[in-house]
Swiss-Prot record:
This is Probable dihydroorotase-like protein. Keywords: Pyrimidine biosynthesis. GO terms for molecular function: allantoinase activity. InterPro entries: Amidohydro-rel (IPR006680), DHOase/Allantoinase_Hydrolase (IPR050138), Metal-dep_hydrolase_composite (IPR011059), Metal_Hydrolase (IPR032466). The gene is pyrC'. The lineage of its organism: Bacteria, Pseudomonadati, Campylobacterota, Epsilonproteobacteria, Campylobacterales. Non-functional DHOase.
């Protein structure tokens, strides 16, 4: 496959050239390449090529194939789906049914990342991560309270998460990372206090990174005043001041990765109190991130690529995440000028007008998604 006249970033440098894909890899990047042996040619003039996103925090309550197609539409090529044998990233859930999993066997079967949903069996899980050189993702089970503690929770009479206790379990993992020198990714980080603790432990030698939900950078808790079930997200959204602080942290590279936090709504309840928690957002991941983070100048386009592709690939030790020769050909082709509107009524972003749309997804050199009438062959 030959991508003609592609615009892309090589590190921080904006380039325009042709990109040849062969045998799952990006094999050649040069100007004025000619097709060979009936090679498929895709015209990318006026479009942008970037690495496909990697999402490390997805909950799949729907069929995996359906979830995967939604992800492709949102520019996400690789998914880490909790409790799913088909997950594109082979994960090891360290605890199942309150018992320690057979981590050694699961690692030998191809497990790529170890996930801890609680601090139970902390010592054993930590030693497995170190012994098998497994990246460790801490994705603590949610408390499933609708709001964070504060004035709005009292005003609306909703159950709330008590902020005073949210970091008590995370600190144990932070100290383990420092003491054992284990790379640890803390999932669903949405508190400035947590980020300050991460920085403090990293200053002491820990190897911690933070992953924050995209929704918490775009929305704040004021949306709860409408009692719409689509905003019932776990963990809950923060107040505006906290949200602005998260944006500053992202801008200052204190947040390493972003996640759609996608979880399908397993309920059609009309009342906020009776509805299920969830965040149906992955099919609009690229457009939401581009619109609210890049166009609104929270971060640069290059930094968006880092927090949604490059850093994840490095954490997983994958040969992917950048548009470079000899990297895996996991790419998306996008139209940055296209305008769309979120149509999924279960999405927290429903009705929002977005900029930037995925035209084609390519995984290991093969097209996995193409928008109708997009990326015409030349």
């Amino acid at each position: 496959m030959l991508l003609k006249n592609a615009s892309f970033y090589d590190d921080e440098v904006l380039k325009r050239a042709d990109i040849r894909l062969k045998d799952s890899l990006i094999t050649e990047i040069k100007e004025n390449l000619s097709p060979i042996n009936n090679e498929e040619v895709i015209e990318c003039r006026d479009l942008f090529v970037l690495p496909s996103f990697i999402d490390l925090s997805v909950t799949g309550l729907e069929g995996y194939e359906n979830l995967k197609q939604k992800a492709f539409k949102g520019g996400v090529g690789l998914l880490n789906v909790f409790n799913c044998d088909q997950s594109g990233i082979k994960n090891i859930m360290a605890i199942k049914n309150n018992q320690l999993a057979d981590i050694a066997t699961l690692k030998n079967k191809g497990g790529e990342i170890l996930i801890a949903p609680s601090d139970a069996f902390l010592e054993l899980i930590s030693h497995y991560a170190k012994s098998y050189n497994l990246p460790l993702l801490i994705s603590l089970e949610n408390s499933f309270e609708a709001l964070n503690s504060g004035e709005l929770a009292y005003e609306l009479g909703q159950n709330f998460v008590e902020n005073a206790f949210e970091n008590t379990r995370l600190v144990r993992f932070m100290e383990v990372s420092r003491a054992l020198q284990i790379p640890v990714l803390l999932d669903k980080v949405n508190s400035i206090t947590t980020l300050k603790l991460i920085k403090a432990f990293n200053d002491l030698g820990a190897k911690l990174q933070a992953q924050t939900p995209l929704s918490h950078l775009v929305l704040d808790e004021s949306v709860y005043e409408d009692y719409e079930p689509r905003f019932k997200i776990a963990p809950p959204l923060r107040d505006k001041e906290s949200q602005n602080a998260l944006k500053e942290a992202l801008k200052n590279n204190e947040i390493a990765m972003l996640t759609s936090l996608h979880a399908s709504k397993n309920s059609n309840a009309q009342l906020f109190e009776e509805s299920a928690f969830g965040c149906e957002s992955i099919e609009d991941a690229f457009s939401v991130a581009y619109t609210f983070l890049v166009q609104k100048k929270v971060i640069s386009f290059q930094q968006l690529i880092k927090v949604m592709a490059i850093n994840q690939a490095k954490f997983l030790k994958l040969n992917a995440g950048e548009v470079k020769e000899n990297q895996l050909a996991n790419l998306m082709i996008v139209d940055l000028n296209a305008q769309t509107r979120v149509s999924n009524q279960n999405s927290p972003f429903y009705g929002l007008e977005l900029y930037g749309e995925v035209q084609r997804m390519i995984l290991k050199g093969q097209t996995t998604f193409i928008k109708e009438n997009a990326c015409k062959k030349s």
